[in-house]
Amino acid sequence: MKKLYEQVQPFKFRLTVFALLCGATMVSIVLYRVRTILSGSTTYAFLVWNIFLAWIPLGLAHTATAFAWKRKYIILSVPCAAILWLIFFPNAPYILTDLQHLGYPKPGVPVWFDVLLIIWFAWTGLLLGMVSLLLMQDIVRREFGRISGWLFVCAVGLLASLGIYIGRFLRWNSWDVFFNPLVRLTEFLGYASHPSLQSILFISMFSTFFIFFYVTTYAFGLLLQEQAQKNQEESL
């Protein structure tokens, strides 16, 4: 048991975060299940699918991290994992836009319950995105430096907001990149050549919100780390 504890000790923070994310996901699904029992409707079934998609970038980020640490096939493996990660990453914060469904009250369930339900799913999805972005930023930071790491975060925030807009308003899916790449590229170039005011406002506001939220979360993480180190030094 002691040997197992020593092996797990270096990864206790990541294991704790993983356990919390799993717990948040389970609570989300339980809330959805309660709603289906109360209403007899599967109106918000898409939330379960969306939270599943939100886990994919986290898995890809862990894969990229594993290859980066082992330095094995890093030139090929990490870029491939990073590209796949970027394609699926918008699915994590995308759930925030599901809050728009609150504008259409559903009979049989109190509005406050639906508010908490969607917020719980959205919060969980956002945290999944934050953790996966933190892992990817760490890879970029170790390979290219701290400034490059933060430039990567800003670029991802902008691209993710673009992806969320495409998913919410144009109704495209991540897998369209694999099954309809040329068609989607042609359509995208058409939209990009004549951007609407709505698209400019949405992408600008969402990317600003996303980056600010990430930086705030990152700063709180540093504060907690400093406090933990301080407590450890005081106990010695």
PLM feature segments, named:
Residues 8-9, 65-77, 138-148:
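Membrane-interface helix-boundary motifs at transmembrane edges
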Residues 116-129, 191-212:
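Hydrophobic alpha-helical transmembrane segments
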Residues 127-140, 204-227:
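Transmembrane alpha-helical segments in integral membrane proteins
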Residues 50-66:
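Central hydrophobic cores of alpha-helical transmembrane segments in multi-pass inner-membrane proteins
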